[in-house]
Regions:
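Membrane-interfacial, low-structure loops and terminal tails that flank and connect transmembrane helices
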Residues: 1, 90-103
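Short, Lys/Arg-enriched, disordered terminal segments
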Residues: 1-7
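A structural signal for multi-pass alpha-helical bundles of membrane permease subunits
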Residues: 6, 12-91, 114-384
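Transmembrane alpha-helical segments of multi-pass membrane proteins
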Residues: 97-119, 207-208
Length: 384
């Protein structure tokens, strides 16, 4: 079928493009609005006039604002960070990662990009604009009121960095365990034609459909009494798992593991079994063939599955709020705790700044892995 035959009529193209543009605006508006609010004083952030929220006259009157130079250079830093990461990062990771450690290479690369962006955007950029603004006259005058004091409050004064660290621990643990078990189980089930493999998949699907609260209730007595149960083995040093990140990792892995097994099994099913046989002929064991031949082909699927596992652990509220104490709380329950009847408008803007902060790693993750995610979803959707 030719390209001309596949081309949509002009009215239909206009209608579909208009609808997609409108839907994108509707979907992106909440993120855009809370981002704008997080840089304003409480007076501007909760003003009934949308223009005052955007331009922040009260914030600018307090001596906090951005000039045209600030805005242009800030957008340039964001644009070039995204563009250079998407274009060069996959090639650099592939070149410099040790053989068999590509995932670790991606994690290190993502951390380096994130740290570098924070250093440039919040460290070097204010110094540069502070020198340029007095020299450029009208272009150096504040045109939009903006302040970063709410981010300083939430990360420095409120100790949100500790919540961020706990989220990283939980997320890294869930993703690591889920992918390790999921790849092995998915590969075995994809290569097995027995009836037992079918029933294992059905049982996994049943466990996946259970409400999260049911699993939490089942694990709760184990975690609370863990010190008593482990004391015959570990003696007086037996730990209480309740309130610790390890408890949350165990529950979230139990919730997420059926999904990862199902998804990875579908990816492995699309890889011809001839690759396994060829590797076996060349002298590889089953595990060596899996590690050196199958897994390099599977990386897009593994990264896609890992992204969904990351989102489950990173955004979880129910399990983390029930099983973690205040000192080990992750970011999502910590933000929810900032909203209560006693909060002031300043506290609410601080909570908004915290909410914006937790979305930044998600954008960075999708930006860095966009090609692998699209490739993995395409591979999982097409058989053969």
């Amino acid at each position: 079928m030719t390209a001309k035959a596949l081309r949509q009529p002009a009215p239909l193209r206009i209608l579909s493009n208009t609808f997609l543009a409108f839907w994108c605006l509707i979907a992106a508006f909440p993120i855009f609005w809370i981002t704008v609010m997080s840089f304003k004083s409480p007076v501007d952030a909760f003003d009934s006039n949308p223009l005052n929220v955007i331009f922040g006259p009260a914030t600018r009157a307090d001596g906090s604002g951005w000039s045209v130079v600030d805005i242009v250079l800030g957008l340039a830093v964001v644009y070039f960070t995204a563009r250079l990461s998407a274009r060069h990062l996959p090639r650099l990771v592939e070149r410099y990662s040790p053989k068999g450690w590509t995932v670790l290479g991606w994690i290190v690369a993502a951390l380096l990009v994130g740290v570098g962006f924070v250093v440039v955007f919040f460290g070097a950029l204010p110094v540069v604009t502070g020198v340029l603004n007095p020299l450029l006259g009208p272009l150096g005058r504040d045109v939009i009121g903006a302040t970063t004091e709410h981010y300083q409050t939430v990360w420095v004064d409120r100790g949100f960095s500790n919540n961020f660290k706990n989220s990283l621990i939980v997320t890294a643990g869930v993703v690591t365990v889920s992918l390790t078990v999921g790849t092995l189980a998915g590969y075995g089930l994809a290569r097995s034609g027995s009836t037992l493999a079918f029933w294992i998949l059905i049982i996994a699907l049943i466990f996946r459909s259970l409400p999260h609260s049911v699993l939490v209730a089942g694990y709760l007595p184990v975690f609370i009494n863990s010190a008593e149960w482990l004391s015959p083995i570990l003696g007086e040093n037996a730990p209480t798992l309740y309130g610790k990140p390890a408890a949350v990792i165990a529950v979230l892995v139990a919730i997420n593991q059926p999904f990862t097994i199902w998804m990875l099994r579908s990816f492995f099913s699309n890889i011809p079994a001839d690759l396994d046989e060829a590797a076996r002929v060349d002298g590889c064991s089953h595990f060596k063939a899996f590690r050196l031949v199958i897994m390099p082909v599977m990386w897009p699927g593994v990264i896609t599955t890992g992204l969904f596992s990351f989102l489950l652990a990173y955004n979880d509220f129910l399990v983390t709020s029930l099983l973690l104490d205040a000192s080990n709380q992750t970011m999502v329950p910590a933000i929810a705790g900032m909203f209560n009847r006693e909060t002031t408008t300043t506290d609410q803007v601080v909570a908004v700044a915290a909410a914006v902060s937790i979305t930044a790693p998600l954008f960075l993750l999708v930006m860095v892995f966009q090609r692998q995610i699209v490739s993995g979803l395409t591979a999982g959707a097409v058989k053969g």
